[in-house]
């Protein structure tokens, strides 16, 4: 079974990397979440179907509150990603779709445009995978990205995921159907992280 560490415990002791702090997303992140999405809307909309629905500060607040509730109900664990040096909010990474019986989760993430291209999402991904295979007790982590989302596919490859196949027209986003490249990583896989 999956084991979900209490949100308040993780909030008081966030996951730290060389450049990042990851703490559970909650209502205190609402304004920063809104600003990050708004400043990166054109970059995010082609790949993430929820972006048009994040239309104002209230919608960001509802999402942040729902994220906290999902964590408390052991449905998902979403983290705000902050720059460790200045505490600036730069994105979200999380484990979604908890299948407790099968010890399986899905990885999801996004980064604001002006933080892209510096290896920050790969760094956050490594930390969350360590957490997933450690305290959360996941056996399998799945991730998918649009077949033409080269930045996301690069993160997935650098994290050492194994390609499993193509899910045709898996998601409708911004008026077009996206094929997804599907990958997974098992706790028993040797993690060849580049």
List PLM regions with ranges.
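A short hydrophobic/aromatic micro-motif that marks alpha-helical segments and, especially, helix-coil
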Residues: 55-56, 71, 190
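Short loop/turn motifs at secondary-structure junctions and domain boundaries
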Residues: 69-74, 161
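Acyl-donor (CoA/ACP) binding surface of acyl/acetyltransferases
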Residues: 1-32, 36-43, 78-194
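Conserved GNAT-fold acetyl-CoA-binding loop/helix
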Residues: 45-66
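Short, polar/charged, Gly/Pro-enriched helix-capping and turn/loop motifs at alpha-helix termini
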Residues: 47, 51, 74-78, 139
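A generic secondary-structure signal
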Residues: 66-67, 131
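Tryptophan-centered motif/residue detector
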Residues: 47-50, 71, 110, 177
């Amino acid at each position: 079974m999956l084991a979900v560490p209490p949100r308040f415990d993780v909030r008081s002791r966030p996951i730290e990397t060389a450049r990042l702090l990851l703490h559970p997303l909650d209502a205190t992140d609402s304004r920063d979440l809104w600003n990050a999405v708004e400043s990166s809307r054109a970059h995010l909309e082609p790949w993430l179907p929820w972006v048009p629905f994040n239309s104002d500060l209230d919608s960001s607040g509802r999402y942040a509150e729902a994220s906290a509730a999902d964590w408390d109900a052991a449905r998902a664990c979403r983290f705000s990603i902050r720059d460790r040096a200045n505490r600036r909010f730069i994105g979200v990474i999380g484990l979604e779709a908890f299948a407790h019986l099968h010890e399986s989760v899905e990885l999801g993430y996004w980064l604001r445009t002006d933080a892209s291209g510096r290896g920050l999402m790969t760094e956050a991904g490594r930390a969350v995978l360590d957490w997933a295979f450690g305290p959360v007790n996941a056996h399998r982590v799945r991730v998918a990205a649009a077949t033409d989302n080269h930045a996301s596919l690069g993160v997935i490859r650098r994290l050492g995921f194994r390609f499993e196949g193509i899910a045709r027209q898996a998601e409708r986003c911004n008026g077009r159907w996206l094929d997804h490249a599907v990958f997974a990583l098992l706790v028993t896989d040797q993690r060849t992280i580049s």
